[in-house]
């Protein structure tokens, strides 16, 4: 897994012009609706092109619902995770996994210099692992065919 760079697992809806984002003054409800529509577990909070934070399903549950806040009036800036941890696009996927595991979070913002490229989540890792395992099994099968 360590050979592949993080950029290789960015999905279309989580990077570039399709990146799901919101302003800090938007309500939690509006952000949650957009997350549901886009089938994603996080939304980046951005203002004037600057990353301020990330709002995740866990933030919704812990910082809003469990705290008894009203989603229709609570602003994202009140419930987001400010200054989220980031990882460089060329860092190995293994490093992303390590950071998410050690930090007990499920989403990691991918950057190139000061530019946000996207978000990877723990949901992205199993698919990568399965694809690598399938490739390895195929390689071994071809090797076995040559030997026999």
Regions found by a protein language model. Name each.
Residues 1-148:
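Tandem CBS (Cystathionine beta-synthase) repeat/Bateman regulatory domains
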């Amino acid at each position: 897994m360590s050979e592949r760079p993080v950029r290789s697992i960015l999905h279309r809806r989580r990077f570039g012009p399709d990146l799901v984002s919101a302003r800090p003054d938007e309500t939690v409800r509006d952000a949650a609706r957009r997350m549901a529509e886009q089938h994603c577990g996080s939304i980046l909070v951005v203002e004037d092109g600057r990353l301020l934070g990330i709002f995740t399903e866990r933030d919704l549950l812990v910082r809003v619902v469990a705290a008894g806040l009203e989603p229709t009036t609570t602003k994202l800036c009140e419930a987001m995770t400010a200054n989220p941890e980031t990882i460089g696009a060329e860092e190995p996927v293994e490093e992303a996994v390590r950071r998410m595991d050690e930090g007990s979070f499920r989403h990691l913002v991918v950057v190139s210099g000061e530019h946000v490229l996207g978000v990877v989540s723990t949901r992205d890792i199993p698919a990568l692992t399965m694809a690598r395992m399938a490739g390895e099994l195929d390689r071994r099968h071809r090797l076995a065919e040559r030997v026999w």
